[in-house]
Amino acid sequence: MGRPRAMGGVPTGSPRDEIIAAAGRLFIERGYAQVTMSDIARAAGLQQSSLYYWFRKKELILQATFSVNRVPLEFINRIGARSGSPALKLYRLVRFDTLQLCNSPCDVNELERLAEGQPDLFAGFWEDRQRLHDWVVTLVAAAMEEGQFVDCDPDLVAVSLLSFDEGIQKRFRHQDQHRAGTASAFCHQPRGAEELAEFAAGTMMRALLRRPGDLARLQRQAADFVDDWRVT
């Protein structure tokens, strides 16, 4: 989907990369709409004129955060050729995708709103989204063919599954505002990204598996893939 990668705070030596990292931190702290080019320049330790040398406008910086960081698609390429049932691969993908969204510097819903308004500028965003959607469809169809999943509409499952991940990201990003003891009228227990990722994968598999008892086996198999937790 071209979803953004969590930005590290260590300078890379490249002004362009440092601008993207600084912007990513500001986007997650304040929200995309509230960040100005001046803010980004200051955070990156640059004069605004130097910032414009690398990026003419804020939208291009945001585009860079996902055009060079196609994290779920890289993950798909990594696990696609490996052994394992379609259901196991889908479990791992949902778990990984939820984790990387929770750790992302940008709100995926903000990205989508921006991309909707400027489809030409963000064509790559939608191309990535289509590839991710299609891969989920393929896995669901294969799991149905093998008798692992109940009969269902793979396209509808893909839309619902990816939307579920994105909804979890939204709640994760705002949970500090709703902890017990805050002024919010709505409070809930905060959850870690890994806990939410496991919950998302388990919930989706429980709804799809023809034999719900297979979930425990899938979870045991997925536990062997510790590399899934490294969002790089």
What positions do the PLM features span?
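Short coil/turn segments at alpha/beta junctions that flank glycine-rich nucleotide-binding fingerprints
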Residues: 29-33, 83, 104, 146-147
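Helix-turn-helix
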Residues: 18, 22, 26-64
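Arg/Lys-rich, glycine/proline-spaced intrinsically disordered segments
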Residues: 2-9
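Hydrophobic alpha-helical connector segments
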Residues: 64, 77-103, 107, 157-161, ...
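Short secondary-structure transition hinges
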Residues: 98-137, 146-149, 155-156
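Short, basic, alpha-helical segments at the C-terminal edge of helix-turn-helix-like DNA-binding modules
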Residues: 67-74
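C-terminal peripheral helix-coil segments that are non-catalytic and often amphipathic
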Residues: 1, 130-145, 170-232
